[in-house]
Regions:
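C-terminal accessory segments of proteins
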Residues: 181-196
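Catalytic glutamate of the conserved HExxH
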Residues: 53, 187, 191, 223
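Active-site-proximal inter-transmembrane loops
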Residues: 73, 131-138, 192-218, 222-225
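Non-catalytic, topology-defining segments of multipass membrane proteins
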Residues: 1-184, 228-260
């Protein structure tokens, strides 16, 4: 396996800067608001709703402008551009918890959590096969090429609003928090929790992640019904599903797919 040094260096830098952000001189109510606002914007609307349920699984439809807005929020999470994220996720579902799964939990907890992305990912060679709907869209190709650069205008905006404190809390600390929240679905939610449904893999329903990861923690439900826009079943809290319902009421979401 070939080490992905750009990814390793970037991740180390973000984690080091996240530690800097936690120094007392950077604390204020303002930075907390910025942190949570951008975490929900990029982690919930961007990754969970946009990258995952909308683009990866096509669990519902939105107007093109809104789909691209959610994809842009996802790109601001710096968890790959939409094409690579969707490619890896579709490969994960195709080979869940087998040797061909990019983040196979059977290779170890830390491999599934983040180790897999520190080496070359064979699935990314199949972008045109696994994500043809995105590859042929010029805007998604643009995000694929430039998603990391989106942190630059965001950083300038944050600096103009609150100096380095806003930058540190709004970019590296927020990125690291959303990273680990997403990664926990690949690791924690394939290790600890309940399996009420037969999904044919190690996916688990983890109530803690169900709440703090915007509904993604109901992971056994998801693997049993991957094309469903609703992951929390029978009263399980699923923030992303409530947002999709709101979009439907506003006439901005349709063809919503539910568990069979």
């Amino acid at each position: 396996m070939k080490l992905e040094w750009p990814t390793i260096i970037f991740m180390l830098a973000m984690h080091c800067l996240a530690i800097v952000a936690l120094q007392p001189q950077y604390w204020s109510w303002g930075v907390i608001v910025v942190f949570f606002f951008l975490s929900v914007l990029t982690g919930c609307l961007g990754v969970t709703l946009g990258y995952h349920r909308l683009l990866s699984h096509r669990a519902f439809k939105t107007p093109r402008w809104l789909e691209r807005f959610f994809a842009t929020c996802g790109a601001l999470s710096a968890e790959y551009g939409p094409i690579e994220w969707v490619t890896v996720h579709r490969e994960h579902h195709k080979y869940s918890d087998t040797d061909l799964d990019p983040h196979d939990i059977n290779k170890g907890f830390w491999w599934a959590h983040f180790g897999w992305m520190m080496v070359d990912v064979p699935a990314l060679e199949d972008k045109s096969k696994l994500a043809p709907d995105l590859v042929r869209d010029p805007y998604y190709m643009w995000l694929h090429d430039y998603y990391l650069w989106l942190q630059l205008p965001l950083g300038l905006l944050l600096y103009s609003l609150g100096g380095w404190a806003f930058v540190l809390w709004g970019i590296p600390l927020r990125l690291v928090a959303v990273y680990h929240l997403t990664w926990c679905i690949n690791s924690v939610a394939h290790t600890w929790g309940t399996q009420p449904l037969d999904s044919g893999d190690n996916s688990r329903n983890n109530p803690i992640l169900g709440i703090i990861a915007f509904g993604e923690g109901w992971h056994n439900n998801h693997h049993a019904h991957p094309s469903s826009a609703k992951q929390g079943l029978q009263g399980q809290f699923d923030l992303t599903w409530y947002i999709i319902l709101t979009l439907e009421k506003l006439g901005l979401a349709k063809n919503i797919r539910l568990p069979s």
